[in-house]
Amino acid sequence: MYLSELQLNHYRNYESVDVHFSPDTNVLIGENAQGKTNLLEAIYVLALARSHRTNTDRELIQWHEDFAKITGLVQRSAGKTPLELVLSQKGKKAKVNHLEQAKLSQYIGQLNVVLFAPEDLNIVKGSPAVRRHFIDMEFGQMSSKYLYNISQYKSILKQRNQYLKQLQRRQAKDLVYLGVLSDQLAAYGAEVTVARRQFLQQMEKWAQKLHQEITKDREVLTFKYQSQIPEEQLDQSVEELYQQFQTLYEKQQIREVEQGTTLIGPHRDDVQFLVNDKDVQAFGSQGQQRTTALSVKLAEIDLMKAQTGEYPILLLDDVLSELDDLRQTHLLKTFQNKVQTFLTTTSLENVKKEIIATPRVFTVTNGVVIEEQAE
């Protein structure tokens, strides 16, 4: 899979741009605040219909404009697929092969991306919410079923929390309706929990292999899924977990009404990364945390290939300068000759020459993208 063409209209600082890319390595060079990261972000948004930098679509639309449009041509082994995403105050409209999609869940997965950014260390060092978001976004690209289930779960969770607030304030008193919401939440919560566990078990295998290569077998990386469901019971079927969630909601009903919020479910779960059986977030060195984050991110590439049959596109947003030679080498080994890559940099000096041996180079200046001619 690769992106052969990208068109932007009224996207951030881009008035109008049409860029044709190499199926191999594409390097975007420019000073800060010229639009390099915006271009990478546009590819990410085209893939996932949301930004990794903001939750507000208005920020993606050029100042004084009513909409932004991103159009791309995806080349797969099965053929070409035109994609289009329009962002406006009315919401998002997504097209595949010029046909508007009724749901974004039908659109996501047409273009798969893996993004490396300076904030990736937050996967290890950040809050549980950061790790849940990471799982949901990455797994959502590979499984439309998971994307649907997590979307339904979040929607029902919002309704249930609102109703718990009403019960807390005595603006409502119908516990039968609360039971209906609890039943629905338990059903989707069980689906999400089982899928997350399976996804993380698969990712762990890839990440372990990469981590051992980087550390030359000195360290072993393992994942531990943390839930209110006891660990020994997490390997149950969806039906068994559904029944367990139902029981927990019944037991916690008085406490949840008192607090006005849902206390049980995968929206409170976490994943713990262990290096040699020690929590790397709490006890790992900066180097161990970086290696863990890199191993987890690199594992996405092979996992997506295994799940979808196609390699994803790799987006490297100003991260190579932060990696030492060893980590750059392992990054290079992972994507060389098999993954279309986009990388941003202010200078080529900090980038290993092997990575940019035959790139297509673009200069980005104030929202204008110019391809440099090969010598």
UniProtKB/Swiss-Prot annotation:
Chief location category: cytoplasm
Transferase listed as a keyword: no
Disulfide bonds: none
BP terms from Gene Ontology: DNA replication; DNA synthesis involved in DNA repair; double-strand break repair; SOS response
UniProt xrefs under InterPro entries: DNA-binding_RecF (IPR001238), DNA-binding_RecF_CS (IPR018078), P-loop_NTPase (IPR027417), RecF/RecN/SMC_N (IPR003395), RecF_2 (IPR042174)
GO molecular function: ATP binding; single-stranded DNA binding
Keyword annotations: ATP-binding, Cytoplasm, DNA damage, DNA repair, DNA replication, DNA-binding, Nucleotide-binding, SOS response
Residue runs in coiled coils: none
Keyword GTP-binding part of the UniProt annotation: no
A GO-annotated cellular component: cytoplasm
CDD domains, A to Z: ABC_RecF
Signal peptide extent: none
Subcellular location: Cytoplasm
Annotated positions binding ATP: G30, E31, N32, A33, Q34, G35, K36, T37
Role according to the record: The RecF protein is involved in DNA metabolism; it is required for DNA replication and normal SOS inducibility. RecF binds preferentially to single-stranded, linear DNA. It also seems to bind ATP.
Similarity-based family: Belongs to the RecF family.
Protein name: DNA replication and repair protein RecF
UniProt organism field: Latilactobacillus sakei subsp. sakei (strain 23K)
